[in-house]
Amino acid sequence: MYFFAPCGFGKTTVANELLKNKKYIRLSPESGEITADALKKADIVLIDDMQRMESEEERQCLLLSIRENPQKRFVLLSRSRVPGWLMPFQVSGLLVTVEYDELFLSRSETAAVFKSFGTEPGEQEITDIFKRTFGYPLAVTLTAREISRKTAYD
């Protein structure tokens, strides 16, 4: 599964919720953690910041692991679209993509975020907030946080 969206769309939050109560490993290309040995440690592998995977060696390790382990599940998070070297998996249907437009919050989800911060604005305020934020998760969360701190809504 490949999630791609700009910063603040909740890719990591969605992945954490998806993998809740599952045994998995979390790897990052920035720290050089993507090795053949690391990829063998669990049946579910989460790799965040895929857009930073510049090492050909890491790419080859990941490709080999995907090809040789059909039972293994990969959750890949990125700020950019599926790179060319992963396209064969997408075209064949083995790699499901979740794009940014699927991560926008609905009006009811926006209201739920506010409730999780211990505040429940009125129906008109929620509608106004939803229109202003377009359901962008980071904007909704920051607004909910500020309102929960008793900052006046403007």
Q: Can you name each region flagged by the protein language model?
A:
Residues K20-I34, D43:
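Conserved catalytic segments around the Walker B and adjacent sensor/switch elements
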Residues P88-E102:
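A short helix-turn-beta junction within AAA+ P-loop NTPase domains corresponding to the substrate/partner-engaging
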Residues P6-I25:
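P-loop NTPase Walker A phosphate-binding motif
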Residues R52, L64-Q90:
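Sensor-1/coupling segment of RecA-like P-loop NTPase cores
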